[in-house]
């Protein structure tokens, strides 16, 4: 299915009257940055262990900024596979007494509720996932939505913005830490592979790239 066909089938509609600048910027889509930490690479069989989502706002001059972050540690679904190498890579300790993990459905319900509020505030019809190697995050998000049976998923099911690609274009770097450093951002490798930290850094990187493009005259609001 093409994106245009998906738009035709979408059951929401944009508000009448003047459109919010954010809605004009991305054709009615609201960028929401997502990062997941998992028990492996297979979204169908491997556990979702952490998820974070950062909504993106726009100031009065049309520049983007990271707005609000939602973060949850997740209880592995029943029968989930967890590779020891994945835990070693992320540093996640499933038996940590302060982990305070929740079920997938509870986490997604809360995140989606916040995203729907952001959609309404920005006059947007749908969220579009932003991620570093975004197909990975979108795959795990879609798998969790399917497992939980959640019907009101605000995200486009297959379109996304990939900051690995954008950073390769803008800075010649595709690794998140190196891309952030090339963009003049601080990046603490000790904090990396936490869904919250990686999401917030990816959001900062995405906003910086989009804002830099605007400053170069690459996008002008038709209503400016």
From Swiss-Prot:
- Binding locations of Mg(2+) 2: 35, 37, 193, 198
Binding of Mg(2+) 1 occurs at 35
Does this UniProt record's set of keywords contain Hydrolase? yes
Q: SMART domains from the entry?
A: EXOIII
Q: Which cofactor does it need?
A: Mg(2+)
Q: What is its EC number?
A: 3.1.13.-
Q: Which GO terms describe its molecular function?
A: 3'-5' exonuclease activity; magnesium ion binding; nucleic acid binding; RNA exonuclease activity, producing 5'-phosphomonoesters
Q: Where is the Exonuclease domain?
A: 32-206
The GO biological-process annotations, alphabetized, read as: DNA replication proofreading; tRNA processing
Q: What class of enzyme is it?
A: hydrolase
| Protein family (similarity comment) | Belongs to the RNase T family.
Any additional notes? Member of the DEDD group of RNAses that are characterized by the presence of four acidic residues in the active site. These residues are conserved even when the proteins have highly divergent sequences.
Q: What is this protein called?
A: Ribonuclease T
Native organism: Pseudomonas aeruginosa (strain ATCC 15692 / DSM 22644 / CIP 104116 / JCM 14847 / LMG 12228 / 1C / PRS 101 / PAO1)
Q: Which gene encodes it?
A: rnt
């Amino acid at each position: 299915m093409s994106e245009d066909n998906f738009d035709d089938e979408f059951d929401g509609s944009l508000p009448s009257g003047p459109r919010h600048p954010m809605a004009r910027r991305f054709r009615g889509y609201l960028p929401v940055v997502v990062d997941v930490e998992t028990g492996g690479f297979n979204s169908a069989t491997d556990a979702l262990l952490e998820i974070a989502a950062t909504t993106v706002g726009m100031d009065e001059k049309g520049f983007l900024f990271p707005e609000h972050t939602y973060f949850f540690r997740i209880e592995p679904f029943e029968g989930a596979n967890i590779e020891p190498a994945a835990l070693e890579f992320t540093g996640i300790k499933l038996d940590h007494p302060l982990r305070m993990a929740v079920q997938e459905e509870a986490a997604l319900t809360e995140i989606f509720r916040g995203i729907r509020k952001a959609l309404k505030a920005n006059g947007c019809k749908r969220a579009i996932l932003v991620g570093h190697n975004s197909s990975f995050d979108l795959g795990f998000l879609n798998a969790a939505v399917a497992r939980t049976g959640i019907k009101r998923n605000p995200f486009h099911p297959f379109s996304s913005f990939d900051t690995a690609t954008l950073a390769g274009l803008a800075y010649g770097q595709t690794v998140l830490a190196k891309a952030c450093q090339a963009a003049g951002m601080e990046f603490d490798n000790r904090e990396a592979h936490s869904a919250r930290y990686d999401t917030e850094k990816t959001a900062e990187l995405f906003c910086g790239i989009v804002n830099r493009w605007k400053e170069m005259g690459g996008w002008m609001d038709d209503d400016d």
